[in-house]
UniProtKB/Swiss-Prot annotation:
This is Protein NODULATION SIGNALING PATHWAY 1. GO terms for molecular function: DNA-binding transcription factor activity; sequence-specific DNA binding. InterPro entries: TF_GRAS. Residues 76-165 are annotated as: Disordered. Induction: Not induced after treatment with Sinorhizobium meliloti. Belongs to the GRAS family. The gene is NSP1. Residues 331-373 are annotated as: Leucine repeat II (LRII). Residues 166-227 are annotated as: Leucine repeat I (LRI). GO terms for cellular component: nucleus.
């Protein structure tokens, strides 16, 4: 599918380059502020406008409030109609800075009486591009750097469902609105502020600002097919580190382990309902687990009354690598590093459990071309489809690849289908403009980053950076076409499936698993018990549902 171009965003780089001479180098590396100090706009000796008062004598315990207030000041002061060069009047010293040794030395040399000034934003009554003007408040700047400020405030998880504390979104979303509306001055201003606050080792807000800034500059850049520099993803890592990091993530977060647990229990439930225990079990794996899901399933299968089936076939549909270098078309969490092979280890483990396992991989096989022949299914086996976090990559407009694929699955006559997906609104260009879609992507990534803040206590963890870098693909992937659980259920019914009630083992197992994790995670079971949802801080993250063939389709 080819995405519809956005005439405004397609040409935005042209007018950015024509207006600001240093934007090309800034877009190439938004975190290298070496370029910035070469330009007069960043002269720290500029006179401070009378509308500001400065107070730099604040300790790091107020870092979170400091940043929030700076956001309020910067969004407020940028809501008025700006002249072409009006951003030159915004002093660099008003922004929280990434200090180096020189900066710290210069601060120490400042006269003591200059540390007691106070910075306030003037009150504004108008908003621009749909962004509500924020009431100006006292801006308190941390005496330390962002990293220290973040440590002083812990993981900032208390801001998970508090819009006022989620300051990164208050910068990213208005910037996307400004890009959509073609407001050059506002884009400039917000990109500068984001550049100063972005950090991959800060709290969830700082990390969201970092990934969001990369995504926005990536959107503005002409080289949109390349992966933004500095991001660690699955494909950029070494296979052993990749597998180790996945296992660690499953241990610390239920983001994937919870739906996998429900799916495994559902497969056993479907298998137990089959009258013939001597049939081959064939699992069609369309997921993102990279093999991590199956060891616990094989163990449970070996303990099953009557023993495991005589043969277990696992057909893994790997994500197509034809777009491996095009982040705009790559489903998050779907493509591992080159050389990653979990088959040998899984086969050895199955042998130790006396489970006769066969693994077949379908590489470079798009879901749109999947059929019974390519899967090699037969009527004398028990086929169960496990589709997790991959089907939202299929187009749901014209052509409606999503509904067609579900009908293909129906034609294979599986005994059960487990569907797990993100529980959120669509972000594609057909369901809204760039600003609308971007705000939904940011919301998704915030929940991921906020939850990993609680899971990974080490801010410099490479494992956490890899998982978050992979999740951040959602900000740039043009095929992130999610839908709410209700819409997915409607599609499944239209394709000829009927919802199946989860058994007690699946429900109780899911609840028991969540007790291992942060208490902000919760599980919600729908009234008819055919769908289970995973929530983080009272907000939906994903759902898992169980389906069988509707014997009497309407």
């Amino acid at each position: 599918m080819t995405m519809e171009p956005n005439p405004t965003s397609d040409h935005i780089l042209d007018w950015l380059e024509g207006s600001v001479s240093f934007f090309p180098s800034f877009l190439d590396d938004p975190y290298n502020n070496g370029y910035i100090h070469e330009y007069e706009i960043w002269n720290q000796n500029q006179d401070i406008s009378n509308q500001y008062q400065i107070d730099a004598n604040t300790n790091s315990s107020n870092a979170t409030n400091s940043t929030t207030n700076i956001v309020a000041a910067s969004t407020t002061t940028s809501t008025t109609s700006l002249e072409p060069n009006s951003f030159n009047n915004i002093p660099f010293s008003d922004l929280p800075k990434k200090r180096n040794a020189e900066d710290e030395l210069s601060l120490k040399k400042q006269p003591q009486n200059q540390k007691n000034k106070r910075l306030k934003s003037r009150p504004m009554n108008e908003s621009d591009n749909g962004d509500a003007a924020l009431e100006g408040t006292v801006v308190r700047k941390s005496g330390g750097n962002k990293k220290g400020a973040a440590k002083a405030n812990g993981s900032n998880s208390n801001n998970g469902n508090n819009k006022d504390g989620r300051w990164a979104e208050q910068l990213l979303n208005p910037c996307a609105v400004a890009i959509t509306g073609g407001n050059l001055n506002r884009v400039q201003h917000l990109l500068y502020v984001l550049h100063e606050l972005a950090s991959t080792t800060g709290d969830a807000n700082h990390r969201l600002a970092a990934h969001g800034l990369r995504a926005l500059t990536h959107h503005l850049s002409s080289s949109s097919s390349s992966t933004p520099s500095g991001t660690i993803t699955f494909a950029s890592t070494e296979p052993r580190f990749f597998q180790k990091s996945l296992l660690k993530f499953y241990e610390f977060s239920p983001w994937f382990s919870f739906p996998n647990n429900i799916a495994n229990a559902s497969i056993l439930q479907v298998l137990a309902e089959e009258p013939n225990n001597l049939r081959t079990l064939h699992i069609l794996d369309i997921g993102v687990s990279h093999g991590v899901q199956w060891p616990t399933f094989l163990e449970a299968l070996s303990r099953r009354p009557g023993g495991p089936p005589p043969l277990v076939r696992l057909t893994v549909v790997n994500a197509s690598s034809s777009t491996e270098n095009d982040q705009n078309m790559e489903t998050p969490f779907s493509i591992g590093p080159c050389g990653d092979t979990f088959s040998s280890g899984l086969l050895g483990y199955a042998q130790s459990l006396n489970v006769n396992l066969q693994i077949k991989k379908l590489d470079n096989h798009p879901l749109q071309t999947l059929n019974a022949k390519s899967v090699d299914t037969s009527s004398d086996e028990t086929l169960i489809v496990c589709a997790q976090f991959r089907l939202h990559h299929l187009n749901h407009n014209n052509p409606d690849e999503r509904s067609e694929f579900l009908k293909v699955l129906r034609g294979m006559e599986p005994k059960g289908v487990i569907l797990s997906e993100n529980n959120m609104e669509c972000c594609c260009s057909s369901c809204g403009d760039f600003a609308t879609g971007f705000s939904r992507r940011v919301e998704y990534l915030w929940r991921f980053l906020d939850s990993t803040s609680s899971a990974f206590k080490n801010r410099d963890s490479d494992e956490r950076k890899m998982m978050e870098g992979e999740a951040a693909k959602a900000l740039t992937n043009q095929r992130e076409m999610n839908e709410r659980r209700e819409k997915w259920c409607e599609r499944m019914k239209e394709a000829g499936f009927a919802g199946e009630v989860f058994g007690e083992d699946a429900i109780d197992g899911g609840r028991a698993l969540l007790r291992k994790y942060d208490n902000n995670w919760e599980m919600k079971v729908e009234e008819n018990s055919t769908s289970v949802e995973l929530w983080w801080k009272s907000q939906p993250v994903s759902f898992c549902s169980l389906w069988k063939l509707d014997k009497q389709p309407e």
